[in-house]
Each structure stands twice: as C-alpha cells, then as structure tokens.
Amino acid sequence: MSTYGFKAFDKNMKNRYGIEFEEGKTYQTNSNVSFGYNSGDEVTGYHFCKNLEDTLRYVDGINDDIKIAEVIGSGNIVIYNDEYYGYYDMYSAEIIDIIHILTREEIINKVLYSKNEYAAERFIKGFKLTIEELEKFKTEYISSYRLQYFLNTQEKNKVLELK
C-alpha cells in the first residue's frame, strides 16, 4: 500500500525532531511503525499528511521559513485522526519518498485550486502570506469577512515593519 501526501520541514529540510531529509531520497525505519515519536534515536515512522494545510500543525509557517514536500509513504502505514482538533488522514509510514519540494507558488496554488474554503482558511492561519498573496484568496468560495481579518493583520504588520 502506498499513500500520497505532504510533509513540512524547516528551511534546512529538517523535521521537528531534527532529522534532515533530501528531495529525491527514500527513508526507511526498521522499528514498529506508530504515530508519535519515541525518545532516543528510534524513528517509529515518517509522518506526513494527506492535506497540505494540515502539515502546518507541525511547523511554524507564520514566523519561520518552511518547506513543504510532496511525498509517498509505503510499507506499513498507520493512520491517525485527531477528531478533537479536526485533523484527519495523518500518517506514519515505514518508508517515505521525498518526491518534490514545492515552490511557494506551487504551495499557494494547490490550496487555491482545491476549492475548499475550510482548507484555505486553515492554510491562511498557518502560513505567512503577503498582502498580494492573500488577495488571490478573494474568491466566491472564501468568506470575505474571514479573509478581511487576515488582510487587516498583514497590513498592520507591514506598517509596523516600516516604522
């Protein structure tokens, strides 16, 4: 079984546990696959999400430069759903292939073309966008009052940066 998804990293292609990854490489663990992380050097699976916006749960896309990759998980795969916070289809896989590091434009377009207001709102809350990029989300499927909040926040931040 293989599953397509997304994985987020810091600007140096490290996950939140400090493990470094490279585009085009495959990683495999020999441990029992589970969702979560054991202390020490044991990797209990490589985490990734079906939905791009859900990867922002694991990195600070507002304050830090991040990278998001398209990945394929295979081998033994464990599925995790966090119903309390509304995160679904998160995976931990025995094997993960880092297929492609998305450009900023590709990241934004994947969310825009999903035509999913909930996904777009979650993305906007977790990914630092410029005012021009936020304007792209002004469409019939994004509630204007929600988007206006983020536009106002970005404009205030821009004014503060100029001072």
PLM segments and residue spans:
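Short, glycine-biased loop/turn motifs at secondary-structure junctions and
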Residues: 1-163
